[in-house]
């Protein structure tokens, strides 16, 4: 009903957060968390990957929709084994959880507030924390593909793909491009196979990525596994068992030398 004085009556609604707001909040969250972690560990490289492990743990538990804090430590141990250097035995990784698990509540609040922008936050968070740690020598040259670029590149994927189709990202970064292809192909193929796990495994067999930075290659692998669980969670309950089913084809150089694919004679290993 129009008010008598000619004003237009409006209904006030709470605005949804924008992608820019989500990115800004993620930067702030990353800075605060990294400073707390590195303030205690005084090791930029380890602090960076502990931060990523904590964030990945939070994302996994959100996908799993499990409120049990008793199992979060087990999830952290599982995920951190793929992100932290192999010399960090379970006892060391468990001590990291005991020291910094309080940060998870901040991550949970972020995911709840910006639920529409959870995809790929792991790789973006790595980019932000990498610039803070300044330990790899690669942070000044890393460029992460924006979503609009990925959408432009992937819109040409045919609706009917063959079993022999292969998708390669030779500089895969945090795996955002491959993650979007995984999502797109899952939508196309799931109804045909009617088996979500088999569908995801078949798609992973067609996705390949190489990354010069071994830490970022590990992030890409974890990022893809989280995306796989997000898709799986749409049709069934997920668990740590499902996590162990998937092994993305992400590779990095055995002995990184800065040349990557430009090196005439280089060998790679698959991220575990």
Task: Describe these PLM feature segments.
Residues 104, 112-113, 117, 123, ...:
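SAM-dependent methyltransferase catalytic region
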Residues 1-143, 232-236, 240-242:
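Non-catalytic, mostly N-terminal accessory regions of nucleic-acid modification and defense proteins
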């Amino acid at each position: 009903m129009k008010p008598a004085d000619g004003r237009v009556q409006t209904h006030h609604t709470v605005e949804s957060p924008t992608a820019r707001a989500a990115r800004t909040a993620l930067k702030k969250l990353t800075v605060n968390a990294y400073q707390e972690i590195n303030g205690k560990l005084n090791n930029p490289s380890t602090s960076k990957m502990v931060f990523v492990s904590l964030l990945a743990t939070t994302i996994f538990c959100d996908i799993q929709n499990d409120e049990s804090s008793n199992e979060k430590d087990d999830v952290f141990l599982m995920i951190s084994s793929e992100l932290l250097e192999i010399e960090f035995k379970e006892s060391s990784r468990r001590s990291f959880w005991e020291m910094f698990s309080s940060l998870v509540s901040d991550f949970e609040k972020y995911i709840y507030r910006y639920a529409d922008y959870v995809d790929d936050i792991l790789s973006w968070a790595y980019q932000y924390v990498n610039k803070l740690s300044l330990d790899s020598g690669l942070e000044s040259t890393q460029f992460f593909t924006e979503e609009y670029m990925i959408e432009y590149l992937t819109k040409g994927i045919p609706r009917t793909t063959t079993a022999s189709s292969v998708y390669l990202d030779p500089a895969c970064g945090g795996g955002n491009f491959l993650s979007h292809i995984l999502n797109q192909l899952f939508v196309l193929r799931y109804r045909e196979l009617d088996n979500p796990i088999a569908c995801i495994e078949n798609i992973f067999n067609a996705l390949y990525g190489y990354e010069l930075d071994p830490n970022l290659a590990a992030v890409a692998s974890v990022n893809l596994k989280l995306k796989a669980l997000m898709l799986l969670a749409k049709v069934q309950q997920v668990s740590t068992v499902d996590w162990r089913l998937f092994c993305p084809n992400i590779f990095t150089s055995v002995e990184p030398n800065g040349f990557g694919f430009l090196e005439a004679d280089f060998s790679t290993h698959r991220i575990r």
